[in-house]
């Protein structure tokens, strides 16, 4: 709950270590993450682009943003599903795993292939090789702890919002902001070092031109267009682009010379944390817990998952209930109404599960 309040966004398995009954955060660089506007949509001169709904915005700013909870990522052309979250990652099945490497090293027959490496055990889980991820077994305890922490934050709300509070000490401090996944920069960096890319400045420029493609979706020049120039200059030096901003500011620093891009940030990380604290109430706690339970349940589902005995017995018991069609429809309608989420403007939406890019995971 505290990580969610402070806007942490990078709680993958390498950034947390399980120690006894505690989960320790060892990389705090993404605390107090700022909220960014959709610069591409804002550059639409016709203003015909439909923005996210209230529920979608709420979902994007939810506890799921922390990266702590199970969530799928789909990698490569095969859309292979992987989970690198601290509480969702799966321990390796065996001590050794096959990975890309070199065969016949230091010989005339040296060639790329698959080699055996010792498997890395996730530090964020209290179990080792061959064990199942135990998090689903403790979901109720986790949700209970989340609710308890949230209630404690509500009790301390006024103290945290005071000008002399610990939260306010972050004002004026600099922090890094990651505008693209660093793996994108690393992939481009490898392309820059390929023989074909080293033959001319034009070949190098064509590799870096790929960074501009996301900006070209805008009808007019977007406000954050200077970001591309900064990315290009830094990658020409074979550096991974690095950007910073003040935790309580709305300007992005483009380089080490003090060049800034005003208005890049919609809501500063510090202001966003204050807003989350002010809006924290029983209904908000319940909403976040629904997301926590939903993401854990979705992680365990598969398109071709067989029905368990428990599921089959439930299905049979429902079929034998002596209810009329009208009563059954009424029950379904009541469930839909109970699960509905209403915003202040009266719009009604529902949370659901979506099929992943691999066509198998949810």
Language model regions located:
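Catalytic activation segment of kinase domains across protein kinase-like and atypical kinase folds
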Residues: 7-106
């Amino acid at each position: 709950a505290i990580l969610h309040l402070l806007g942490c966004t990078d709680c993958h398995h390498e950034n947390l270590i399980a120690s006894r009954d505690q989960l320790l955060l060892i990389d705090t660089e993404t605390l107090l993450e700022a909220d960014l506007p959709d610069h591409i949509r804002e550059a639409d001169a016709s203003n015909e682009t439909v923005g996210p709904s209230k529920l979608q915005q709420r979902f994007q700013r939810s506890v799921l943003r922390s990266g702590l909870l199970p969530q799928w990522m789909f990698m490569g052309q095969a859309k292979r599903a992987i989970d690198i979250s601290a509480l969702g990652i799966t321990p390796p099945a065996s001590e050794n795993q096959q990975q890309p490497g070199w065969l016949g090293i230091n010989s005339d027959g040296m060639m790329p292939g698959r080699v055996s490496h010792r498997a890395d055990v996730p530090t964020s889980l209290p179990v080792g090789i061959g064990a199942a991820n135990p998090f689903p077994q403790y979901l109720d305890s986790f949700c209970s702890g989340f609710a308890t922490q949230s209630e404690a934050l509500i009790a301390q709300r006024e103290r945290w919002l005071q000008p002399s509070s610990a939260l306010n000490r972050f004002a004026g401090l600099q922090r890094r902001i990651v505008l693209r996944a660093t793996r994108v920069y690393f992939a481009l960096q490898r392309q820059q070092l390929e023989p074909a890319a080293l033959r001319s400045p034009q070949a190098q420029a064509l590799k870096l031109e790929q960074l501009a493609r996301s900006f070209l979706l805008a009808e007019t020049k977007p406000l954050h267009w200077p970001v591309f120039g900064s990315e290009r200059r830094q990658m020409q030096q074979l550096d991974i682009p690095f950007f910073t901003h003040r935790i309580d500011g709305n300007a992005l620093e483009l380089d080490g010379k003090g060049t800034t891009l005003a208005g890049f940030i919609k809501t500063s990380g510090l202001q966003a944390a204050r807003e989350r604290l002010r809006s924290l109430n029983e209904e908000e706690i319940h909403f976040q817990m629904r997301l926590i339970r939903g993401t854990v349940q979705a992680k365990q589902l598969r398109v071709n998952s067989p029905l368990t005995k428990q599921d089959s017995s439930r299905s049979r018991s429902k079929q034998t209930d002596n209810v009329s069609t009208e009563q059954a429809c009424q029950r379904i309608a009541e469930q839909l109404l109970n699960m509905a989420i209403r915003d202040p403007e009266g719009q009604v939406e529902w949370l659901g599960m979506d099929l992943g890019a691999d066509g198998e995971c949810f």
